[in-house]
Amino acid sequence: MTAVREQIFAAIEAALTDADFAAEIERMPSAGPTKFPALHIYDGGDIPAVGEAGTDRWEMSVEIEGTVEGGTGAEAHAAMSQLDTSVIETLFVEPVLGGLATEIEAGAIRPLVAERASKRRLGFTRTLIIHYATRRGSPQVID
C-alpha cells in the first residue's frame, strides 16, 4: 500500500498537470525551472494534530513555488498573481484532493524576484496546509 501522504502529493501533481496552465510542473526538483510558467511542489513535512480513538490526524505543509518570466514588472506581477489564483482554484475543490484529505487551507504567499536572471522572473511560494486522517498506526490507510 502507498502512504496517504504520497497519495496526496500525487493527487496535487496530477490536478495541476491536468489543469494545463503551467509549462513545467515538478515535485521536489533539484534545480530551478527551465520552462515558464513553472510550478514546483515541495514537501514541508507534517505534524500530528489532535486525534481520536483509532485515528491519527495530521497537518501537512506543502509549498508550491510558482515562477513566471518576461514582460514589464506590472505584467509579470499580474501573471504571477494569476498563476497563484489558478493553483488555488485547481486544488480547492470538493471532495478535497479526491477524498484523501479533510481540509485544505491557503497559508502565506511570499513573492520572489530573481534579481540575477537573464530575463525578468517573478515568483512566489504559497504554503498549503492539508489536513488528513489515517487509521492509528497505519499511515497507508485513510480513516
What are the functions of these language-model segments?
Residues 1-31, 44-143:
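Charged, amphipathic alpha-helical segments and their flanking helix caps
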Residues 35-45:
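A short, hydrophobic beta-strand-centered structural micro-motif
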